[in-house]
């Protein structure tokens, strides 16, 4: 089934392997597509490469439970939502819990940094929609870094379509996490 309600538990190493499978699949598709199709494949490949870099920041045996598994119909296997995986990796680095990290469901925010609710958004190649949140901060992981944006400032970071940037600075850069994710090379 192709639904965000599907949940998957895998190790970081297994998720890295899924990224490799998707890169191989996109490379096969790219060879048969027109210019627009090749461009879409190239974006998907870049996204998977960034995700691999982020996954390499945690031990391969770290277990993650994520929502948003989809793509069974076209792939023959499931691929998790990239944002859910990134959220788990962020939680791994910012919380005490280092085993069985899970994406949170239905709380109005993704996790708390101390007592401050925080919403995690991911925009590695295409822009994430800046949705309203109860959280005081948005933690944006994009292709050029990890950014902390105050709730009142989120809308000043979006483009005309209300999307957060994938290749621009946005808010206050969290240098140590950006470097750990390999996002300091852009």
What are these regions (language model features)?
Residues 1-186:
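Nucleic-acid endonuclease domains
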């Amino acid at each position: 089934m192709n639904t965000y309600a599907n949940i998957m538990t895998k190790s970081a190493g297994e998720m890295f392997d899924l990224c490799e499978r998707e890169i191989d699949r996109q490379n096969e598709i790219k060879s048969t597509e027109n210019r627009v199709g090749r461009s879409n494949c190239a974006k998907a490949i870049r996204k998977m490469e960034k995700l691999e870099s982020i996954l390499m920041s945690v031990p391969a045996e770290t277990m993650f439970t994520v929502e948003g598994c989809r793509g069974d119909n076209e792939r023959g296997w499931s691929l998790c939502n990239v944002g859910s995986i990134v959220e788990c990796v962020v939680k791994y680095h910012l919380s005490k819990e280092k085993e069985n990290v899970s994406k949170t469901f239905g709380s109005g925010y993704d996790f708390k940094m101390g007592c401050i609710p925080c919403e995690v958004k991911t925009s590695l190649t295409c822009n994430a929609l800046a949705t309203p949140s109860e959280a005081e901060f948005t933690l944006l992981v994009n292709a050029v870094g990890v950014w902390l944006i105050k709730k009142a400032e989120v809308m000043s970071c979006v483009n005309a379509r209300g999307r957060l940037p994938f290749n621009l600075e946005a808010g206050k850069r969290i240098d140590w996490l950006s470097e750990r994710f390999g996002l300091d090379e852009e």
